[in-house]
Amino acid sequence: MDRDEVAALLALPIAGVLLVLASRMVRARAGGLREDRAWARLVLPLAPASAVCALFAGWAFAGPEEAQSLALVNIVLAVPFALVLARAVARAIRSLLSTAAATEPARTAGLIRPAVIIDEAFARSLSEPELRAVVSHEEAHARHRDPLRIWIARLATDLSWPLASSGAEARFVAWARALELARDAEALAHGADPHDLANAILVAAALRSAHAPEPSASAAIANDASFLDERIHRLLDSAPPTVRASSRCLAWTWRAALASLLGVTFTIGLVYGERFLPLLAR
């Protein structure tokens, strides 16, 4: 086998086990989290697995392009984790090709350059202030590149299947709800009237129920009765909903920490990997 193939087969079971353990250690919370903290709880279990992959990538990069031997037991151990990875990637690709989101009354589409799309029938059913409130909410999604973040979150959740899928799914739902509440608050901060936005949310929910018997995952979360009530009550409360915006400093701190972790582990694999990683292949 090539060195990079051996590295991948060795990394898969170790990274997979660490991902499952980390996912089971991070508890899901039903609500009350800020969006940025809910996001951190969702993607944090990926850090140990990513570090392992970086370690083996450094080792593969450092070595010569020559055939490597690998014990049969290593291949057998890698198979179930390879199947989980293949399933997660297949579901991620399918979500990109799915047309379920196209039935949404209002949506933000595009992973790289998100754009706001409003269904014509939905727009006609709203007053001008209500339509502006909807556009303001969707523009908040576009500013934060939420379609890409939702896609990454769904992939991260699927990678925890099947041993830690329930906890990962609960964290995904908690983050998706916190995301909508944060974008509602951002729309109000940009001048949207809470009553107009609440009315538009109810109209959108009615349209989803009537025209999308099999809604997308995001639409199903948005249409959940208990969460819909929570959104409306927050908007119509005497005090405007105040969901703190994500801290740019905190976000960049997380990114820098992850980049440092991956850089350090890659360097360790690059410099010292030949001393101990080949022992795993015997």
PLM regions: where:
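Short, surface-exposed, polar/charged, turn-prone segments marking secondary-structure boundaries
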Residues: 144-146, 162-163, 263
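Short glycine/proline- and charge-enriched loop/turn segments
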Residues: 159-167
